[in-house]
Amino acid sequence: MDALGRRISKNAKEITFTYEGKKVSAVEGQTLGAALVGAGHLSQRKGRLGGTHGHYCGMGACFECLVTVDGRSGVRACMTPVQQGQSVKHHPYKTAFYADASRHQSDPKESLEVVAVEVLVVGGGPAGLQAALSARKAGASVLLVDERASLGGQYFKQLSSAYSTKDGKAPDKQMQAGRTLIDELAAADIKQWRNTLVWGVFREEHDQFRIGIERDGKALIVEPKAVIIATGATERPYPVPGWTLPGVMTTGGLQTLLRSYRTAPPGPVLVAGNGPLNLQVAAELVEAGVEVAGVVESAKLTSLTALAQTGKAMRHAPSLIGKGLGYMLTLKRAQVPVFDGYAIAAIEGDSAVERVALAPVTAEGELGQPMRHIKVKAVGLGYGFQPQAEISRLLGVEHHYASDTASALKVLSAERFPDGRCNVEGVFIAGEAGGFGGAQLALAQGALSGAAAAKHCGYNVEDTTAHWSSQQRKHQHFQKALWSAFSSPLKPLAGITDDTIVCRCEGITAKEIISGREPCSDVASIKRQTRAGMGRCQGRYCAATVNMLIASDQKTGSQFDLPAPQNPIKPIAIGALAIEKGEWAGHRRVTMPTARVINESTTLPPSIEVDVLVIGAGVAGSATAMSLAKQGVDVAVLDRGLPNGQASGGNAGSLHVQLLSFDFGKKAESGGGPAASTLPLQQASASLWEQLSKELDSDIEFKRNGGIMVAESEEQMRFLERKAALERSLGIDTQMIGRADIEHKLPAISEAIIGGAWCGEEGKINPLLATPALVRAAQQAGARFFTGEAVQCITYANGKWEVTTSSGRRYRAGKVVNAAGAWAGEIGKLAGVSVPVHAAPLQMIVTEAAEPIVDVLLAHADRHLTLKQAANGNVIIGGGWPAGLSIPFGYQRPLLESIEGNLWVAQHVLPALNQLRVLRTWAAININIDGAPILGEVPHRPGFYNAVTSNGFTLGPLVGQITADLITRGKSDWNLAPFSLARFERQGAA
């Protein structure tokens, strides 16, 4: 396509590749995505529900255009150059493994290469380019990294190398301005790394930043003195029925195809949304010869208010308004209709876009009548922008919700000064990474941030503040007037229906999210229960919508209402990070910060009286409440957060019946005796989970396929023989097996494995589903749950316990159960009881969904490892690797060294895992005692019971049953002496 007619021509050779066996023509220098869309192949990735997805964001953030290239799956078509002879296919929802074993190898390495630099600029758009130039001009050494093959970002998009103009100049002033900056960058001795992914951010206690990047398939660490975050924004999702159909893309994604790669989807194309970008893209499509069905604008551009605001904007930037009027004139000449005051109500079609339903926007922001229907083949959606805040959130930058330009939505924006400084010393945020403001404002912020970063590094900076500050103020005034002209009352969720898909990655609908509000009511809990936000995009295109869906007034709260940010920022191959680490004993304990109290709006009486009050709504507390309520006991559960919000919702879901390797022998705490004494309880509780899986109201993904602990030396086999003998003496049927038996169960097992121990009673469960199911069962039996209630005072008088919470409410009960997990020590202290519980955060890692590779619970005889595959195909990797706490907010967060070591063990045991990418890591608080639970009534505190345990998810149901029996019957069928508080007194005496 000759988009600007006579001026642009191809300067690269034409090549061919195949897509699903069909020959496709392309131009060397295009991306696979551009070539596929231009050829009319709009479907790329297959979804969880069976449908297909295609090119959407065009900037590598959404992962909707994934394809399989020459057998390598998970390739982003929009970021991957086309090559002669490639064999390209749809990407399946579950990644298939290579048959070629040689592809399983990972390059051995002792550590990741570390690159030191004074100023690291992340992002090569307007803000990043100007920031890099400003910092370098002041004398600082600068490294600029960008994920794309060419610099310029979304605004200064450059022609790909496949095309050029006849006179050698850029096709238009916008592109030329970007080229000028890029040329200045090249001449300024600024190191620039393109095609470079920032995958992780780690902030150490001494405030050293470690930025994980991937370049040419190799992971590196950059250690800068200052970081300038200039990652820009993504387009805000507009969920309506049909918005996931192939052929629906963001306006920016549509523009990238056109401006950089001279291609577009087959017309007619409809451009819809809110803001001037839509007019620009529609006009550029017209000039390129693409059939444009119309422009849908939710604002009333012809209203007197809009015209007056346009006049104000013109005073600040007449050339920009002139460009906008030029776009309107182009559309008018081409007889392209502009439907102002309308929004898309639905996009219709079976497997591709066929037509679009439009509705007028009412004064209240709803979609009205009558509807209009337009036949189209592709749609560009542009309903505003949202900052890419992953890096800033990981670094601990404070954020707030700010009004999004012209719409009714508030978006998460960074708290920053005009020069980009924020609450984290050495971190600077420039341009739309901190909040939307347009390219000209981003240039000014970039210049100011670059100078401030150089000053932070100790350089004397030429005072250009006055000029750039003036430019900043000028364009802030311009943006305010411009977006006042585009002001629209349209509500963000006006077009959503029950069946509308909200999470594109996992195919989760609005109805599923709304149904999941009970017993959950925050984004993190909904994420755990529904999987919304667990896909490759990590919630970029659904978290804000989920947040609004669970709030009755469609409003957002604070940054803490979103799930805690975690690494990796974007998926990265296991093999790139796997590094062998040494082994250790024990757990790394931390002092936990006070957990945040959620703001639950409840209208409850000032005091509540019950028979039993349970403190803690994790698996142990919920199981206790369920067991008590089923026996007719009036029971209430308190939690400062939401049910399943801490360790119970953050563990890997292993059901352990045999001892882990670090719970036996010289690595074991307290010699291993307490852990061994707990094994019969674990065995019984695993069976109780099996019974509950048949009784609870939903599938908790319980599976009991057994567990294998593998060995790769004769010494490790002898260790397992001793461990298995102990387990058999306790009634656990653990048997030694050879390599042939392991290979029969696990064909992908490493050749290094010579044998192992097999326990058929082990299994797995989905903790994200299991605890909520227990909560519902408890509620159905009459238990009440009160969230947002942090316990502040516990007293005992006249045979009653009184618990006062942060709301000022008083709960009175004859008996209190301390099921507060890692905070059980705090609760005990309030009641005058010393409960020796410590917090030790542990990490978990999850990969992309894959075809079945492991059907058992897998562990290692001399390494920290647990490994299993979830029902949907994700491989979950854990095994007791330590995590830490983020600065300054105290989020539980994996450590880089633990991620590297855990991945090494996993791929060492199952080499095929090297083909998979890590989707996310997270950490949860492990309850560190001595290897055994603390159960039962405290003798000198009548009516105060402990139900506290490590390995809590395995033991949860039985702990609940035992505690309920003690309360209702005054006894348990189990010998609880090994699990009483008295054992610590005996240890002290000894």
Where are these regions (language model features)?
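Dinucleotide-binding Rossmann-like beta1-alpha1 core, especially the glycine-rich loop
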Residues: 220, 654-741, 864
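C-terminal catalytic lobe of FAD-dependent flavoproteins
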Residues: 339-403, 424, 431, 479-550, ...
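N-terminal Rossmann-like FAD-binding beta1-loop-alpha1 element of flavoenzymes
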Residues: 118-143, 281-286, 610-637
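FAD-binding core/adjacent interface of flavoenzyme oxidoreductases
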Residues: 50-51, 71-120, 157, 177-268, ...
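Active-site lid/adjacent beta-loop-alpha segment flanking the redox-cofactor pocket in flavoenzymes
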Residues: 429, 433, 437, 455-462, ...
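A Rossmann-like FAD-binding core segment of flavoenzymes
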Residues: 179-213, 286-390, 803-804, 811
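Glycine-rich FAD pyrophosphate-binding loop
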Residues: 137-155, 293-302, 630-651
